[in-house]
Amino acid sequence: MLRATVVKLGANLCLLMALTAPTGKSHAQQRQTGWIADAQNGCRLWNPDPGPGESIKWDGPCVNGFGDGKGTLRWFTNGENDETDEGEFRRGKLNGIAIVTWNDGRRFEGQWRDHKPNGQGTLRTKDSQVYSGEWRNGCFQQDNRRATQNATDKECGFR
């Protein structure tokens, strides 16, 4: 009887530990897309890949609480500028012609729709690769060359 109780208690304890064990990321750390607001003017812009310590600075029109029109969006991580988006925005997302530069040397210049490259554009990577031509929903495929921007390989059908 005592032994059975210990086994049962042990099994319940193991179950309790399994249910409460850390899963690698806390709920607060899980990355989800969404909106981010400029702390100074409250204007919201789309954040396709949120990360800890991010903030933005929006220089452009704010219509109904969203960045809208020609403007410059600067992205910061822990106070350091790591991306600049210059161009046309509609309801907080890149829409139209824009130039996006990253501090690691990447640069995209071209057409955007709903915050993804869509239409003619050129991506220059940090290792001097150039992907120039037609982009569809953040996906580039030409001959045997493939690239993504604000899209995954799976979303682009590259798997």
Map each language-model feature to its residues.
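Bacterial N-terminal signal peptides that target proteins for export
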Residues: M1-L13
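C-terminal segment of classical bacterial N-terminal signal peptides
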Residues: M17-K25
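Glycine/tyrosine- and acidic-biased, solvent-exposed loop/turn segments at the edges of beta-strands
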Residues: G24-R159
